[in-house]
Curated annotation (Swiss-Prot):
Its cofactor is Mg(2+). This is 3-methyl-2-oxobutanoate hydroxymethyltransferase. The gene is panB. The lineage of its organism: Bacteria, Bacillati, Bacillota, Bacilli, Bacillales. One of its GO terms (biological process) is pantothenate biosynthetic process. Binds 1 Mg(2+) ion per subunit. Pathway: Cofactor biosynthesis; (R)-pantothenate biosynthesis; (R)-pantoate from 3-methyl-2-oxobutanoate: step 1/2. The keyword Metal-binding applies. SUPFAM superfamilies: Phosphoenolpyruvate/pyruvate domain (SSF51621). Keywords: Cytoplasm, Magnesium, Metal-binding, Pantothenate biosynthesis, Transferase. It comes from Bacillus anthracis. Belongs to the PanB family. Its EC number is 2.1.2.11. Transmembrane segments: none annotated. GO terms for cellular component: cytoplasm. Coiled coil: none annotated.
Amino acid sequence: MKTKTDFLKMKEQGEPITMLTAYDYPSAKLAEEAEVDMILVGDSLGMVVLGYDSTVPVTVEDMIHHTKAVRRGAKETFIVTDMPFMSYHVSLQDTMVNARRIVQESGAHALKVEGAGEVISTIHYLTNAGIPVVAHLGLTPQSVGVLGGYKVQGKDAESAKKLIEDAKKCEEAGAIALVLECVPMQLAELISEQLTIPTIGIGAGQKVDGQVLVYHDLISYGVNRVPKFVKQYTSVQEEIVRGISQYVAEVKTRQFPEEKHSFTMKEEECLALYGGKQS
């Protein structure tokens, strides 16, 4: 399993880091088989798995439950778990309780937190307690209400400078990596050059140290539309619907199950059971 040291070395050597979300045993197992470097159990599970309109309703219990499943499916992959909405915008003591629960109960190797400001002290606090932290700047889904929706961040010089400052503060506080979401590629490149920790981009262009996408977006599974920054590498959704539709049709017309899908009794047992009457 790759570690923080490996990711730092990959950045130094210019080897891109691959990260993918996973939310359950099968998706994690497939991600590991595909040799993904890092798995993110994102609070995006609220939208793509649980059917919520945002990540806000996701709880600490949800994150623990799904991370445990992911750990069972990807035992040799570094796993990062999101701290959900309002689980770390509380007192440092309560933040530690939530963080401890997620790490101890789920087996996550690191936690991800969104934003800067007071979150910088949270990163420092958790790091000092021995919990690796991944920071997340740019578009932070838990704060879309404050940001005015899902919009690109850092498009003007002033806000870009603020993001650069925040990125440096995240590193100084002890973050082991930084996710940059929906920021101009020029800004992402500049931030990546000024940090020693890896930057993982999602809608941040090529000049970052790694990329992350949502599992369901990448394979077109249960999603009707995807953001501009997503490339869909396959469409399992069409195959799944086709397969289920065929199953429904064959059951309705009694084509399924066939004899080869059924079990039989020996003739003498049939006679003993109901006098040999067979349907």
